[in-house]
Amino acid sequence: EDILINNIAWALRHLPLFGVFGDGEYRLQPIYVDDLAALAVEQGKRGENVVIDAIGPETFTYRDLARVIGEIIGVKRPIVSVPPALGYAVGWVIGKLVGDVLITWPEMKGLMGDLLCTDSPPAGTTRLTDWTREHKDTLGVHYASELARRKNRRKAYENL
């Protein structure tokens, strides 16, 4: 289960609208965790030093990713552009309500900086849209907490 994808679906299921930071036109190329694991094992066996862009076969803008997830899970919400500072503030409030850190400022800047997209060929084969269709009935039903998955729930965020 991917936290970002699950929580986009959660927000679409539970909030009256979905906000994207800025214009939402920054891109992502999500890779399925099993594809990433297989890639790591394959490269570990080779013993070479290589740099691989671990990306999946589909490219989305953030706005389109939210729209596609909503369509697949059967939830239509307005997708609205919000100033980054407002989006961060709303994320902070929702984070407090769910007992998590919804998004950090560096994560938001990286996302908006188009850092999750390259021109490399995909390293994974599993399409996010296919995976989402397979999990549409359970995706986003429950919030997935980043902090609950950590043994030390404060250490990674103390310097942010």
Predicted region positions:
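Flexible, glycine-rich beta-alpha linker
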Residues: 1-9, 26-27, 60
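Short, solvent-exposed polar/charged micro-motifs at secondary-structure junctions
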Residues: 1-2, 30, 88-93
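Short, glycine/charged-enriched secondary-structure capping and boundary segments
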Residues: 3-12, 34, 67-69, 96, ...
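Hydrophobic alpha-helical segments typical of transmembrane helices
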Residues: 4-7, 107, 127
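A conserved pocket-lining segment of Rossmann-fold NAD(P)-dependent short-chain dehydrogenase/reductase
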Residues: 10-31, 35, 39-48, 53-55
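Residue-level signal for threonine
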Residues: 21, 104-107
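Mid/C-terminal beta-alpha module of Rossmann-like enzyme folds, strongest
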Residues: 39-104, 114-160
